Regions:
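Acidic/His-rich, metal-assisted hydrolase cores and their charged scaffolds
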Residues: 1-172
């Protein structure tokens, strides 16, 4: 099985995972409360396209061979009650790690979360999973040139930075 932990809010990343799973004939399971809520809403609003017969309920996962399943889950930051943390700690009621499972973290730990993330990684590897967590992160934030392009296209009267470190906000 392939298990991918990502931010529920990164709908584009989830779409990429679904597209790849579909291309290779894998069924997709969405797990984690926020992941289910956001992807359901994104699908209803047309922000994400899930091909017919690709998405299955987690209860159906046991009906498919491991090599035909991709589980997209919350928990990329080691959050205690996120689905991946519960899976790693063997307290998830529907998923248990099997030797040979591939678990991909699609983001770097946010500063301050490293200890929790590495705890989850260690628990997964101790259960026989192959964990991929380096060189998988692609920022969801626009770079300087992308911001310039957005401003050029939209020509806003005002631009107010609202997220980031003070030194970055000041330069913006």
């Amino acid at each position: 099985r392939i298990i991918i932990a990502t931010f529920a809010s990164n709908v584009d990343r989830v779409q990429q995972i679904i597209n790849s799973a579909y291309k290779y004939g894998r069924k997709v399971i969405i797990e984690g409360r926020s992941m289910v809520n956001i992807i359901t809403t994104a699908s209803e609003l047309g922000y994400i396209n899930i091909p017919d017969n690709t998405l299955i309920d987690i209860s159906q996962m046991k009906n498919y061979p491991d090599e035909k399943v991709v589980l997209i889950t919350t928990g990329s930051q080691g959050e205690n009650m996120a689905a991946l943390s519960r899976i790693a700690a063997s307290i998830h009621n529907k998923v248990a790690i099997k030797p040979g499972d591939v678990v991909i973290f699609s983001s770097h730990p946010i500063p301050g979360n490293e200890k929790a993330v590495f705890k989850v990684i260690n628990e997964l590897e101790a259960k026989g999973a192959h964990v991929i967590f380096e060189d998988t992160h692609v920022s969801g934030h626009a770079c300087r040139e992308e911001l310039k392009l957005i401003y050029a296209l939209t020509k806003p009267k005002y631009a107010i930075p609202v997220h980031g470190e003070y030194r970055h906000l000041k330069r913006h």
